[in-house]
Regions:
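Short, polar loop/linker segments at the starts of domains and inter-domain junctions
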Residues: 30-34, 102-109, 221
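Short, flexible loop/turn elements at secondary-structure junctions
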Residues: 60-62, 91-93, 145, 179-184, ...
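Short, hydrophobic alpha-helix immediately C-terminal to the catalytic nucleophile
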Residues: 152-156
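N-terminal low-complexity, Ser/Thr- and acidic-residue-enriched intrinsically disordered segments
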Residues: 1-60
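A conserved cap/lid and substrate-binding interface adjacent to the catalytic center
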Residues: 40-142, 157-174, 193-196
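Gly/Ala-rich beta-loop-alpha elbow adjacent to hydrolase catalytic centers
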Residues: 143-147, 151
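The feature captures the conserved acid-bearing segment of alpha/beta-hydrolase catalytic domains
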Residues: 167-238
Length: 238
């Protein structure tokens, strides 16, 4: 179940998040066509098929764009057949998208991260339709920093009943959402009093990114914060 935190899956999910970065050579505009090559390699080595990326992985980024990568494969679990969909959201080497990090909006959730969330959901629905996926699905989504907040908000929307299309079904137990160093993009009103324990936030309290947008401005994260050890802990050496 996605509600159970698993260290092995957390380590794989960090790999998924890193693989979703634009490749280092994409810093040069003439190399953008292959900027998703790390995700392709990761997905192929994990046995996935139907490996696709949205246009922003291979075009110059804009302020409110976001890179999205998807892959899928058929698996069997608990005696049943599912399509496992892996979603890696770009969280580094995204150039102009830095501007979207500062788009808080006048009220409510973080406007820039919400735009990213909506793009991920739209692309995921299109991916499911274009690849002909039907029936029960398991969704594995991961992101780092900016894209961790986006993945976090995607998980929150799905837990709240957002549909991925009439031809597929997703149980909350089949959502595996791992977010690394996520900023806070949701509001306290959205997350309080509800259960989002299939969303796992791996947080280093020494990272300033995890404190924005600010708690004092009523921002929050979906899910469970899992704080990594720091030298400030009394039992750090243990």
């Amino acid at each position: 179940s996605g509600y159970t935190y698993r260290q092995d899956l957390a380590e794989m999910s960090l790999g998924l998040a890193f693989a979703a970065f634009s490749s280092k050579d994409s810093e040069y505009e003439d190399q953008l066509a292959t900027s998703n090559r790390n995700f392709i390699s990761f997905a192929e080595q994990c046995g996935f098929e139907n490996i696709r990326s949205n246009k922003w992985m291979t075009q110059p980024a804009e302020t409110d764009s976001i890179g999205i990568n998807c892959a899928s494969k058929t698996i069997r679990d608990n005696g049943g057949q599912y399509t496992l969909i892996a979603v890696g959201v770009r969280g580094n080497n995204y150039h102009a998208e830095w501007g979207g990090n500062a788009r808080l909006g006048a009220s409510g959730e973080h406007a820039g991260f919400a735009m990213g969330r909506d793009q991920v959901l739209d692309y995921l629905r299109a991916y499911i339709a274009e690849t002909g996926i039907t029936g029960r699905v398991k969704l594995w989504i991961s992101g780092y920093s900016r894209s961790a907040s986006v993945a976090n908000m995607v998980g929150g929307m799905l837990d709240d009943g957002c549909s991925l299309g009439a031809r597929v079904s997703l149980s909350p137990h089949d959502l595996y959402c791992y977010c690394y160093e996520p900023p806070m993009g949701a509001t306290k009103d959205e997350v309080q009093g509800r259960v989002y324990e299939n969303i796992h936030n791996i947080v280093n309290t020494n990272d300033l990114v995890t404190y924005v947008a600010f708690d004092s401005w009523d921002f929050a994260r979906y899910g469970v914060d899992r704080v990594v050890p720091t030298k400030g802990d009394a039992n750090y050496l243990n």
